[in-house]
């Protein structure tokens, strides 16, 4: 009777150890996934900011050309 209980307790202890180890592994994987997602998000933000800056630079160049044209028209007319 005692021996059976010890076996059951040992079995439960091993199962608990396996479960705990699996939980640690899952937590590590989730943390890695989170880190990767944060890096991807930062890269996307950088890419979006770069695209926005390029768009704004083009807009500024266009406005500068328009201003030059207006100045020329003013000088001519």
UniProtKB/Swiss-Prot annotation:
Organism superkingdom: Viruses
Gene from which this protein is expressed: Segment-9
Protein name listed in UniProt: Protein NS4
Role: May function as a nucleic acid binding protein that modulates transcription of genes participating in the IFN response.
Subcellular location: Host cytoplasm; Host nucleus; Host nucleus, Host nucleolus
Annotated keywords: Host cytoplasm, Host nucleus
Primary location: host cell
Keyword rRNA processing: no
Organism, scientific name: Bluetongue virus 13 (isolate 13B89Z) (BTV 13)
A cellular-component GO term for this protein: host cell nucleolus
The keyword Transcription is annotated on this UniProt entry: no
